[in-house]
Curated annotation (Swiss-Prot):
It comes from the Eukaryota. The modification Omega-N-methylarginine is found at R424. Residues 78-98, 127-139 have a biased composition (Basic and acidic residues). This is Lysine-rich nucleolar protein 1. It comes from Bos taurus. The keyword Transmembrane helix does not apply. The gene is KNOP1. Residues 1-28, 55-161, 184-305 are annotated as: Disordered. There is a cross-link at K7, K126, K280, K313, K347, K367, K369, K401, K436 (Glycyl lysine isopeptide (Lys-Gly) (interchain with G-Cter in SUMO2)). It is found in: Nucleus, Nucleolus.
Length: 452
């Protein structure tokens, strides 16, 4: 490991620049060498960052020791315990090195230890043998802290545009991202930004610490806004204004929710008001319909023209039966019951022979001859002189034209049946010989005779 101790002599209140060469001493790995490494402090303290400057110009005057105690009260005791042996080793070794590059690298690593020494005032008093060296170390630690926090604020602005989760873990990400090249670049930035009064540095440090000490915010986005607003410019003494975004957001949401609730309640009231008259109307309509249904049977008046002779409950079409059928039914009932005297005076065109009376004959003699052959005059009833009421609508016999059509249809049916009998083999893909002639002969036999 490379170790060094930086000393600066102050004469007549004016700081002087002195470059002292340090020797590179390789030590075996011990408990103290492990503690001196930067990775160890990055793992133990997540807020710890690598040094920002390799070369420091000691231009700031001495700072009182009272302010140092106020700054870091909340520092972890773990860092204090591990820093005490480290500082005692580095204070005792004031050897000189001959190469400037090793001096810059050793200075960058030793500044982290000196910064932690300034954070723990108790350890500084116990282990520092030279009071001037202690004061210079505290000044260096303060300046380093200021530049580190400014760098953090700048990187927080860059990370906030990319991802809000980087803002919450900005400190831990930054500890692993800075390398040897970052140390050299930050040394140049530190020389430019270091030209300022010590009071400005102390004011900035206090403001930043107050912002960080006031507790972790509930969300990652408000923390990004605080880091952006709290990063001061050069020479600015204005207090950082912290915008408390999460306090205003729920208030706005509550007002919107209240407005929505009011609108919903108004709509519900209006719907209830509109539903009540609608229900009343429906009830009135139901009452009217029930009253009309009750009044309908009383409104029906019997028709004087229609006389219902026979009514059946199951047959609703019985009331619409024509009068001719009604009379026929009534006559049949009267005849079966023996009430036939009322029909004696009436004249009937039909006779008792049924449909044979309607057949077309050339003269009356042919008709009588036909009826006698059919046995129409046998077993005549005693009331032959008057016609029977059953022949009121007799079934009519076929006329001459209808008889001819019926004869023709019967002949066609017979011929079709005969053709089916002799063409049994006929079907799809089979046809009989057209010249074949069939003869009916009783003497013909199907056996073949062989003549010798």
């Amino acid at each position: 490991m490379i170790t060094k101790a930086h000393k600066g002599e102050v004469g007549l209140g004016l700081p002087e620049k002195k470059k002292k060469k340090k020797k590179v001493v390789k030590e075996p790995k011990t408990q103290y060498s492990v503690l001196n490494s930067d990775n160890y402090f990055a793992e133990v303290c997540p807020r710890a960052t690598p040094p920002l400057k390799g070369v420091i110009q000691e231009q700031a005057p001495r700072m009182p020791l009272v302010k140092k105690k106020k700054k870091k009260k909340g520092h972890s005791t773990i860092c204090e315990e591990h820093l005490e042996p480290e500082i005692t080793l580095r204070a005792g070794r004031t050897e000189r090195s001959h190469s400037p590059r090793t001096q810059a690298l050793g200075l960058s690593k030793s500044l982290s230890a000196e910064k932690r020494k300034s954070m723990s005032p108790g350890s500084r008093v116990k282990t520092s043998p030279d009071p001037r060296q202690d004061e210079e170390v505290t000044r260096v630690g303060k300046k380093l802290k200021k530049h580190k926090k400014e760098k953090k604020a700048k990187e927080a602005t860059a990370f906030s545009g990319r991802d809000p989760w980087f803002c919450e873990a900005g400190n831990t990400v930054y500890t692993h991202s800075v390398g040897k090249d970052g140390v050299r670049e930050q040394a140049a930035l530190g020389q430019k930004q270091k030209q300022g009064s010590p009071r400005e540095h102390s004011v900035k440090m206090k403001k930043k610490k107050k912002i960080h000490w006031e507790g972790d915010p509930p969300l990652g986005h408000p923390e990004c806004s605080w880091s952006l607003e709290s990063s001061p410019t050069k020479g600015s003494k204005k207090k950082p204004v912290r915008v408390e975004a999460p306090e205003y957001i729920p208030i706005g949401d509550g007002s919107r929710a209240s407005v929505k609730k009011k609108v919903k309640s108004k709509k519900r009231v209006e719907q209830a008001d509109t539903e009540e008259p609608a229900l009343k109307r429906k009830k009135k309509k139901k009452k009217r319909q029930q009253s009309e249904v009750a009044e309908e049977p009383w409104e029906e008046e019997p028709d004087t023209d229609l006389e219902v002779v026979l009514e059946k409950k199951g047959n609703m079409d019985e009331a619409h039966i024509d009068q001719v059928r009604r009379k026929a039914l009534q006559e049949e009932i009267d005849r079966e019951s023996g009430k036939t005297e009322a029909y004696d005076t009436k004249k009937w065109t039909g006779t008792q022979f049924g449909q044979w009376d309607t057949a077309g004959f050339e003269n009356e003699e042919q008709k009588l001859k036909f009826l006698k052959l059919m046995g129409g005059f046998k077993n005549l009833p005693p009331s032959f002189s008057r016609p029977s009421p059953t022949v009121a609508r007799p079934s009519m016999a076929l006329s001459k034209k209808a008889a001819d059509t019926l004869q023709r249809n019967l002949q066609q049916d017979y011929d079709r049946a005969l053709s089916w009998k002799y063409s049994r083999g006929a079907g799809l893909g089979f046809s009989t010989a057209p010249a074949k002639v069939f003869y009916i002969d009783r003497n013909a036999s199907k056996s073949i005779k062989f003549e010798d």
